[in-house]
């Protein structure tokens, strides 16, 4: 008999829609506190053009790059951190409600004396949710702490998973967890820098960014919507390249087809803009989580991986 988790992996709730229009924004933040008006304008434009889900980059609310001259509570990310819900979420709620859209944007989130690198999710019916980055990268650890909980957003298209930048590129466990729990769409809010005009900058960025996102599509048979910063943010240059990827064709006759397709966007898109595509989520078949017709059980083996990770955790703890 299948467990509740196994049933959730393979089942599809009744009434779930397949067709969804997703918009990702190449967004150039003004360093500091002047971005919410422009986020709202972009959200209204995308939603007015039919977008159901609108995605902004990591730290879109304030800008990403820290000022090395600032320390302690004077750091921009700490000074401008907001609660979720908070003022910026409230500013976007009318847009989400009017257009029936979901809006996702990155910000420094304050919860008491703690600050997180977060993605806020504004839902059309008024819910406001927060995903807190599980793996802060490098200098981010000087102003934020680790999140502890994945976020699956309940939508008319089934559960949608949220991740932020380093979570997506170096830790494939998060995307796999979401796909195993039924997500057919993964949202990546990112601030991935690169100097595309310098030496092998474009090649390195493409290998790290596009190759990794495409790998998630192939490995998990889900769609990925990635929104990146663009332009000069304080002293760091961001290349944009926001894009939407997904399975290219339906699997047929029991044959595997590890093909991916870029539905919208390009690695060379380096200007501020909205990039949108209408997706058929029925292509996200997530075959490895379903019963293999030759064995009667899924190829996906979480009980095995749990044992392996317990061994790794014990080693890391010095046991």
Where are the predicted features?
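N-terminal active-site segment of His-dependent metallophosphoesterases
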Residues: 1-53, 187
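C-terminal beta-strand edge segments of enzyme domains
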Residues: 2-10, 223, 229-319
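Active-site catalytic loop in hydrolytic enzyme cores
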Residues: 5, 110-212, 260, 276, ...
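Conserved beta-strand and immediately adjacent loop positions that scaffold enzyme active sites
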Residues: 21, 104, 118, 149, ...
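Residue-level recognition of beta-strand->loop/alpha-helix junctions
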Residues: 26-28, 57, 65, 132, ...
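Cys-nucleophile CN-hydrolase/nitrilase-fold catalytic domain and related Cys-dependent amidase chemistry
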Residues: 36-127, 192-215, 219-222
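CN hydrolase (nitrilase-like) catalytic-core segments centered on the catalytic cysteine
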Residues: 81-102, 169-273
